[in-house]
Design a protein with these regions (language model features):
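Alpha/beta-hydrolase active-site loop
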Residues: 82-105
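Alpha/beta-hydrolase fold nucleophile elbow
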Residues: 105-117
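N-terminal cap/lid segment of alpha/beta-hydrolase-fold proteins
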Residues: 1-32
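Conserved alpha/beta-hydrolase
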Residues: 61-83
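The feature captures the conserved acid-bearing segment of alpha/beta-hydrolase catalytic domains
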Residues: 150-156, 163-211, 215
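Hydrolase active-site cap/lid region
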Residues: 124-171
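C-terminal catalytic histidine-bearing segment of alpha/beta-hydrolase fold enzymes
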Residues: 40-43, 85, 204, 208-255
Length: 255
């Protein structure tokens, strides 16, 4: 530690420590990447899109596909109960800075955020951060929770995670939860392309809440591709939808 004990975010998250804050597909790249994707974890640290918080190379369902096309993929570690709270946003900002520095990316370099369940909600809430320096090129959310206040008690072990996510906010708990609830942040969403996936047999988050959220986004003039998957339970995807995900990412990341 420095003699004066001063530390900055970069002392923790920098080009040399990226692998401690996210698993990447860098080992699969055959040339310097031209774009990047950040994937956010679901509750507990895993992901219905393939990620795992065990530190190591990322070999998820999209890792090789993206690497072959010059796209760095990073499965981030903002915390298994974070729900993209302000601490998670700060960590992701620092990680974006480190990635840009390591790979020589500029603010014009295309990048996307994505995730499923808590990670899908995280992708939406992170996109609403309000700082143009950290506004992604595109956002993909699979089966996200979009109405936190309504779904706090959707499962016995869920309330503690929401409480922990915003426990240090100096405001009433209901107001704090609104800051991480997508339906309450529609006004803050930037005008970028969105792809949102709704599992119609979802046992945690009612499909009609997603319908209302997408309608609200479109009502504000946002470009949203919206797929409703019949018979899919929470976190499930069809083979056809995986292909749609690949097409969406390539369409916005490859020039």
């Amino acid at each position: 530690m420095r003699p004066d004990y001063t530390l900055t975010d970069r002392d923790f998250i920098n080009p040399d420590t990226i692998d401690l804050y996210g698993n990447t597909n860098a080992h699969l790249l055959t040339a310097p990447p031209a774009a990047f994707v950040l994937e956010f974890p679901g509750l507990g640290g895993g992901s219905c899109l393939g990620g795992c918080m065990d530190v190591g190379p990322y070999n998820g369902p999209l890792s090789g596909f993206l690497a072959e096309r010059g796209i760095l993929q990073v499965y981030t570690f903002p915390g298994p109960w974070s729900w993209m709270n302000r601490g998670a946003v700060r960590m992701i900002h620092a990680l974006v800075d480190a990635i840009r520095e390591k790979y020589g990316f500029t603010r014009e370099t295309p990048w996307a955020v994505m995730g499923g369940s808590m990670g899908g909600m995280g992708a939406l809430i992170y996109t609403a951060n309000g700082d143009p320096a950290y506004t992604p090129t595109a956002c993909l959310a699979h089966c996200p929770c979009v109405d936190v206040l309504d779904r706090v008690y959707c499962k016995e072990n869920i309330p503690r995670t929401f409480f922990r996510a915003v426990a240090d906010y100096e405001m009433p708990i209901a107001e704090a939860l609104k800051t991480i609830s997508p339906i309450c942040r529609v006004e803050d969403m930037p005008h970028i392309p969105y792809h949102i996936i709704n599992d119609l047999a979802d046992e945690l988050f009612p499909p009609e809440q997603m319908d209302a959220y997408v309608e609200a986004l479109r009502g504000k003039g946002h470009t949203v591709t919206y797929h409703r998957l019949p018979n899919c339970r929470h976190g499930e995807l069809t083979g056809e939808e995986w292909e749609v995900i690949r097409t969406f990412l390539l369409g916005h990341l490859v020039k």
